[in-house]
Every structure is written in C-alpha cells, then in structure tokens.
Amino acid sequence: LSMICATAQEESLSISKNQKWGIRKRMQDGTYLNGMSPFGYEKQESQLIPIEREAEIVRYIYSSFLVGVGTVQIAEELNRRYPKENGTWYVSAVRRILMNEKYIGDVHHQKNFTPDDLPLLCQKNSGQLPQYYVQNHHKALVSRQEFEKVQTLLKRKGTERKNQNTCAFSNKL
C-alpha cells in the first residue's frame, strides 16, 4: 500500500511540475493571464478588455490622487458616488489600484509563488524564481506618466509617514 501511495505522490508532483512549466512558458511568451481580472477589466478569450463604467472609476481614482486627494478621502467619495454591489470601497483597494501596473497595460508575472515543497504557502518572489514583465499587453486605462507620478507620490507619502513621531516622547531617550 505504501508503494502505491509513494507512486501516486510522485505522479502528482510530476503533473504539478509540468503544469507550472507550461504556465511559466506562457508567461515568457506574454500569453498567460491568471484567473482574476483586475477591477476595470474583464477577461475575454485570454484578453483583458476594459469595462468602461469601471474604467471611469479607475481614472477618477488616479486623477483625484494626482490633484492631492488622499486615499481615505477617495475611498469615502467612491462609497458615496460609486457604491459597490458586493461591499465597500476600502483604502486598501484604492491603494492596490494605484499601485497596479495592469492599469498602464503591463503585466508583471510571478511576483509571488507557491513552493513545490510543504508547506504550500504563497510567498513573495525575492529572486527564487524568474519574474516576467510584459509591456503593452492590453489596453491601458491610465497613461504611463500618470502612473509614474502616482508611484512617486505614494513613495513620498510613505516616507513622510515613516518619519512622523507618533508620541510627544518619541526619540527623547
């Protein structure tokens, strides 16, 4: 019985490795799309196609942030103007949209991965596996210039927040 189990386990690992190889090959070729479409797009025949109503919301998020509106205020305004059918607009969702390269038409594959051995927990790819970046993969919803400005502002705001003292006695000892 243990021989049968060991053989079945090896077969399962072999199938998994073959599937991963096929996915990575499609990533290299620029033809791979994962299962989830980002907000603003729908998947049609392995293509990301803009959904115009959602694309307008994405553009609103970018334009608001570029004129100085913060992510908290953007989320609050989205909940007033564009309530979600299945929930609430959160600051984290706004930040993810602002940081996602898919909105300039690019795809960055294998930012995270699941290792072959146990425990099978998804982890950040810090060079363990190759990453693939495909430019102009699909129609952009915002310009590269807008995206780059937003990334600069996000980085600056993150640095400012880290340097703020949260207590009157911080750095006094």
Regions found by a protein language model. Give the residues of each.
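Basic, short loop/linker segments at the boundary and entry of helix-turn-helix/winged-helix-like folds
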Residues: Q44-Y60
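Catalytic and ligand-binding motifs that coordinate phosphates/metal ions
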Residues: I23, M27-Q28, E76-N79, K124-L173
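Surface-exposed extracellular loop regions of Gram-negative outer-membrane beta-barrel proteins
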Residues: G68-E76
